[in-house]
Swiss-Prot record:
The keyword Aminoacyl-tRNA synthetase does not apply. This is Disintegrin-like leberagin-C. Glycans are attached at residue 120. A motif (D/ECD-tripeptide) lies at residues 68-70. Residues 4-90 form the Disintegrin domain.
Length: 205
């Protein structure tokens, strides 16, 4: 036996749009406590773009930018939800031309070294990256099955990442996938890493 819904018991039951308790105790301004129905003027109950049961004004920021390549979320005025995250186009210069936007981030080697080895780390000298032409150990561009594919001379900065840890550690690297240069990283002027190749930014995006 299924009990009929009881308006005012603070349980959302079949046939009710809301249930905020008795009229004396109800703290939900969107809900008519006497009928357990939403007021006729209600547009929304909750959400980043809902305030006092109404959609907030179009253009109101509902999500802050997370990076120079990320776009702030703005309410549409027609929905309670913040729209899906949007980014600046891939390939747009960022961080004062040290990088290019890639999927909402600005990947640069200096930041990757910082994340791997801490505040004293920066990008190693170009000569270190020549190791990636060897195709042995940790130094390669790609793997095919168990075979290591060495980097072509023009692609060495899209293989293993090399960092310098001040004051005196040169050509430091990290093993595994974490130690590879991130996709979308600037490898030369107007070029980015894509599929472990250093390619023209305007061509790939």
């Amino acid at each position: 036996i299924v009990s009929p819904p009881v308006c005012g018991n603070e349980l959302l039951e079949n046939g009710e749009e809301c249930d905020c308790g008795s009229p004396a105790n109800c703290r939900n301004p969107c809900c008519d406590a006497a009928s357990c129905r939403l007021h006729s003027w209600v547009e929304c109950e909750s959400g980043e773009c809902c305030d006092q049961c109404r959609f907030v004004t179009a253009g109101t920021e509902c999500r802050a930018t997370r990076s120079e390549c990320d776009l702030a979320g703005q309410c549409t005025g027609q929905s309670a939800d913040c729209p899906i995250d949007r980014f600046h186009r891939n390939g747009q210069p960022c961080l004062q031309n040290y990088g290019y936007c890639y999927n909402g981030k600005c990947p640069i080697m200096h930041h990757q070294c910082y994340y791997l080895f801490g505040a004293n780390a920066t990008v190693a000298q170009d000569a270190c990256f020549e190791e990636n032409k060897n195709g042995i150990g940790d130094f390669y561009c790609r793997k095919q099955s168990d075979r290591l594919i060495p980097c072509a001379p023009e692609d060495v900065k899209c293989g293993r990442l090399f960092c310098e840890i001040l004051p005196n550690t040169r050509c430091k690297h990290a093993p595994g996938d974490n130690g590879m240069v991130d996709p979308g990283t600037k490898c030369e002027d107007k070029k980015v890493c894509f599929n472990r190749k250093c390619v023209d930014v305007n061509t790939v995006y």
